[in-house]
C-alpha cells in the first residue's frame, strides 16, 4: 500500500517541467529495502510526525488560567495546544470575530472607512487571514510541529492537499471558516475568547534581582485580569502595545525589516515566463516566483509574499496612513499576480535611535504614502517604465492595478527612501532577465509595503519568557520570532508547551 507524501514540480527547464512525487510505501521487508538503498538520498524511512504533548494538566487542575493576547496564527495555536492539554486558556483580542472583521475590512476597501481595531491587521485570524494563506516556511522543524499545524487546519476544513503539496496554501475565504471552526474546538475544550478587549497596561512587581514579575493585565474598560502566565502574541502591527511594553521596562530591541512596494503583472505573463509551453497545465496551477538582487548601494532587493492570481489590498491599521499587502484565494484565479518588491533595512544603519525607532520610520513613510495618494486611502502608484525613467505616471497602460479603494498615479519616489528607490531601479532590469516582462513598462507598482515583519523583538530566554519580566511569554511574528502563518503557528505551539511546563513545575 502507498500514500502520497509530497508533490511538487521541477521548473528549472521551463519547457520540460517535471512533476515530482514522494510516496510513503508500506513494505513487509522494509529493513532489507532500506539496507539495499542505504546510499540513495531519495529512499529513506518515513519519519514519525505524530504530535505528543510534553505535559498535560494534572487531574482536577483548577489553577489560574493562562492568558493569550492575540488571536492570530500564533495565539490561535497557543490557545489550541493549551486547551488540548487541559489548561482552559483565556484568549484576548482587540479586534472582532472573523466575519464581522471581514465586513469592517471591506469597509476600508469599498468605502475608504477604516476601523483601527478591526481591519487587515487586527481581529480573529490575524493578518494571515487576508493573505495568500501560504503554509510553508524555512524554519528548522525537527519535531514536525508544522505537520501538527497542517493536520489541525485539515480538521478545521482546509483541503487535505495541504498535507502533501510542496508549497501549500489556503486562501482568504477558506481561512475565515477554518478559524471559526478552531475557535469552536477551543471553546469546547474549556477555552474562552474575549473580543474587542484591548490590553492597555501590565501589572508588574519588582523582584530582588532587579527583574520584574507579571501579576496581571489592565484592560481598556478599566478592569483587571489576574494572570500568572501571559502569552504575548500580538502580531507585527501592535504598535501601542510595543510602546506600552517599552514604558513598562520590558526588554525590547529593534530588528531589521524591509520597505518597498507591491508590483503587479498579468498572471499569464508570469505563467509563460516560468512554465513556457506548459503554462496553463492544471497540474501546475498559477506560477509563483522568488527573486533577489544585491544592489551596488549595499542594499538587498527581494520579492516578498508573492501572491499568484491575487490582488493588492489596503492593509493599514492606523488613520492617515497607507500600507499595501497581497492576498489570494485558494483558486489563485484573479487576473494579476502581485508581490512585494522590498529593500532590507536594519537598525544600525537606518533607525539607530532606540527599540521603537523602526515604528516611527514605518509611520513616516506610510503617512507620506497617504498624502501622495490623495489623503483618502488611495495608494500611490506608478508604471514601471515611468519609475525607471524617474518621471511621474499620469495614466495606466496595459496592466490595471487591483488595490482598492483606488490608486493615484504619481511618482513613488515621493514616499520611499532614496536608497530604496535606487536599489529597486537597479533590480528591475535584472529581474526582467530572469522573469520575462518583469520590467515591462506597463507593469504597475503601488506603495508602500512596510509591514514585512515586526520592527521590534520582545527578547526572550531559553525558557521562552521575557528576559526581564517573569511569566511574560513573547511569541510569534510581533515578538520577532516568526514570519508568516506556519512559523507563527509553530512558535505558538512551542510557547504553549513552555507555559504548560511552567504551570506544572510551579505546583
Segments the model singles out, each with a brief description of its role:
Residues 1-19, 23-507:
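Residues forming the flavin
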Amino acid at each position: 500500500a502507498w500514500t502520497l507524501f509530497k508533490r511538487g514540480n521541477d521548473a528549472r527547464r521551463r519547457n520540460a517541467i517535471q512533476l515530482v512525487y514522494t510516496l510513503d510505501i508500506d513494505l513487509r521487508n522494509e529493513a532489507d529495502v532500506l539496507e539495499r538503498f542505504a546510499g540513495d538520498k531519495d529512499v529513506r524511512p518515513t519519519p514519525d510526525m505524530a504530535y505528543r504533548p510534553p505535559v498535560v494538566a494534572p487531574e482536577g487542575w483548577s489553577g489560574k488560567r493562562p492568558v493569550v493576547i492575540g488571536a492570530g496564527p500564533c495565539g490561535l495555536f497557543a490557545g489550541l495546544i493549551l486547551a488540548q492539554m487541559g489548561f482552559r486558556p483565556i484568549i484576548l483580542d482587540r479586534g472582532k470575530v472573523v466575519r464581522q472583521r471581514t465586513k469592517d475590512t471591506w469597509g476600508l476597501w469599498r468605502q475608504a472607512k477604516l476601523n483601527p481595531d478591526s481591519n487587515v491587521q487586527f481581529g480573529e485570524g490575524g493578518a494571515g487571514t487576508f493573505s495568500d494563506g501560504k503554509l510553508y516556511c524555512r524554519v528548522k522543524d525537527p519535531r514536525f510541529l508544522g505537520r501538527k499545524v497542517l493536520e489541525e487546519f485539515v480538521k478545521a476544513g482546509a483541503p487535505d492537499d495541504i498535507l502533501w503539496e510542496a508549497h501549500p496554501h489556503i486562501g482568504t475565504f477558506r481561512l475565515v471558516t477554518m478559524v471559526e471552526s478552531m475557535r469552536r474546538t477551543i471553546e469546547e475544550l474549556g477555552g474562552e475568547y474575549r473580543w474587542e478587549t484591548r490590553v492597555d497596561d501590565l501589572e508588574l512587581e519588582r523582584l530582588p534581582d532587579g527583574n520584574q514579575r507579571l501579576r496581571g493585565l489592565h484592560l481598556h474598560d478599566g478592569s483587571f485580569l489576574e494572570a500568572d502566565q501571559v502569552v504575548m502574541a500580538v502580531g507585527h502591527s501592535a504598535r501601542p502595545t510595543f510602546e506600552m511594553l517599552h514604558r513598562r521596562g520590558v526588554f525590547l530591541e529593534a530588528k531589521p525589516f524591509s520597505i518597498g512596494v507591491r508590483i503587479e503583472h498579468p498572471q499569464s505573463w508570469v505563467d509563460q515566463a516560468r512554465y513556457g509551453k506548459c503554462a496553463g497545465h492544471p497540474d501546475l496551477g498559477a506560477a509563483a516566483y522568488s527573486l533577489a538582487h544585491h544592489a551596488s548601494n549595499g542594499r538587498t532587493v527581494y520579492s516578498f509574499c508573492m501572491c499568484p492570481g491575487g490582488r493588492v489590498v489596503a492593509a493599514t491599521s492606523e488613520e492617515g496612513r497607507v500600507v499595501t499587502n497581497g492576498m489570494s484565494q485558494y483558486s489563485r484565479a484573479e487576473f494579476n499576480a502581485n508581490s512585494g518588491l522590498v529593500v532590507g533595512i536594519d537598525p544600525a544603519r537606518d533607525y539607530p535611535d532606540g527599540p521603537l525607532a523602526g515604528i516611527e520610520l514605518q509611520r513616516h513613510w506610510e503617512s507620506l504614502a497617504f498624502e501622495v495618494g490623495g489623503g483618502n486611502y488611495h495608494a500611490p502608484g506608478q508604471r514601471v517604465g515611468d519609475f525607471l525613467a524617474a518621471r511621474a505616471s499620469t495614466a495606466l497602460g496595459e496592466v490595471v492595478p487591483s488595490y482598492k479603494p483606488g490608486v493615484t498615479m504619481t511618482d513613488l519616489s515621493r514616499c520611499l527612501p532614496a536608497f530604496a528607490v535606487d536599489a529597486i531601479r537597479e533590480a528591475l532590469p535584472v529581474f526582467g532577465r530572469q522573469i520575462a516582462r518583469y520590467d515591462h513598462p506597463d507593469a504597475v507598482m503601488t506603495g508602500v509595503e512596510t509591514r514585512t515583519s515586526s520592527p521590534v523583538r520582545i527578547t526572550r530566554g531559553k525558557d521562552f519568557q521575557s528576559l526581564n519580566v517573569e511569566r511574560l511569554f513573547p511569541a510569534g511574528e510581533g515578538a520577532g520570532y516568526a514570519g508568516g502563518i506556519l512559523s507563527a503557528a509553530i512558535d505558538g505551539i512551542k510557547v504553549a508547551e513552555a507555559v504548560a511546563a511552567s504551570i506544572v513545575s510551579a505546583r
